[in-house]
Amino acid sequence: MPTAANLLAIMPFPDIDPIAFSIGPLAIHWYGLAYVAGILLGWAYARRLAANESLWPGNASPMTRTQLDDFIVWAALGVVLGGRLGYIFFYDLPAVLRSPVRALEIWNGGMSFHGGLTGTTIAMIIFARRNGIPIWSLFDIVATVVPFGLFFGRIANFINGELWGRLTDVPWAVVFPTGGPFARHPSQLYEAGLEGIVLLLVLAALVYGMRALKSPGFITGVFVCGYALSRIFVEFFREPDAQLGYLLGTNWLTMGMVLSSPMILLGLWAMLRARRQAALQL
């Protein structure tokens, strides 16, 4: 158990202004730049995947670059609207019911990955049906590039000094401006590493080393499982949302764990389904 003396002795938070720069009266926040960077890098990587026909079933890309360019708008709307609505529903519903205008206060924070995933999934299904694109291949393209957004988003969380971790005295602990006087796990960086870098590399190895895109849905399953396991692991180091705390009277169960646990089963199902479909085509 870390002592108060140890907790106070850890390095302070690197004081980074959450506003990256300003153009006249317009303030550009790091969090907004993170969204832009994640979407642009993901889009560029997705275009490379779509253009490489040898990666896909029958050596034929499931969608054109023009279709992919059109989908970016759908994806962005799915992420933003789904992320905001998901946060309201999963984490902040009582407060929004008391003051509905709170739902519009995006500048005060409040985005949910699970909500963004739901919103993007709905956008993908509608877009695929309207454009005659194999839905599982579209799922795979998006799953392969999502880690870019996760990485930059968690880095922005760290810069903003939000979503910090539990009390600790590890050498790399940080004293966050809004986290009290004691040192905490930089859990945002743990998530950036696992959900961003590690998951991106694993998926890239499967795409290029094992040609996993030739089994539509397999990459999606790996991503869903990988994210869920990473999130559940980091939740043991992350401070739960103040308005919810720990659930069911425990001192460890969080909403993040509850929302992520079913994703493991969903991901396993997607992988098994993809393998069965591939076997039937042999």
Curated annotation (Swiss-Prot):
It comes from the Bacteria. Its EC number is 2.5.1.145. GO terms for biological process: lipoprotein biosynthetic process. Catalyzes the transfer of the diacylglyceryl group from phosphatidylglycerol to the sulfhydryl group of the N-terminal cysteine of a prolipoprotein, the first step in the formation of mature lipoproteins. The gene is lgt. Belongs to the Lgt family. Pathway: Protein modification; lipoprotein biosynthesis (diacylglyceryl transfer). This is Phosphatidylglycerol--prolipoprotein diacylglyceryl transferase. Signal peptide: none annotated. Keywords: Cell inner membrane, Cell membrane, Membrane, Transferase, Transmembrane, Transmembrane helix. The chain crosses the membrane at residues 23-43, 71-91, 106-126, 132-152, 189-209, 217-237, 252-272. PANTHER family: PHOSPHATIDYLGLYCEROL--PROLIPOPROTEIN DIACYLGLYCERYL TRANSFERASE, PROLIPOPROTEIN DIACYLGLYCERYL TRANSFERASE. It is a multi-pass membrane protein. The lineage of its organism: Bacteria, Pseudomonadati, Pseudomonadota, Alphaproteobacteria, Hyphomicrobiales. It comes from Rhizobium leguminosarum bv. trifolii (strain WSM2304). A 1,2-diacyl-sn-glycero-3-phospho-(1'-sn-glycerol) binds at residue 154. HAMAP family: Lgt. InterPro entries: Lgt (IPR001640). PROSITE patterns: LGT (PS01311). GO terms for cellular component: plasma membrane.
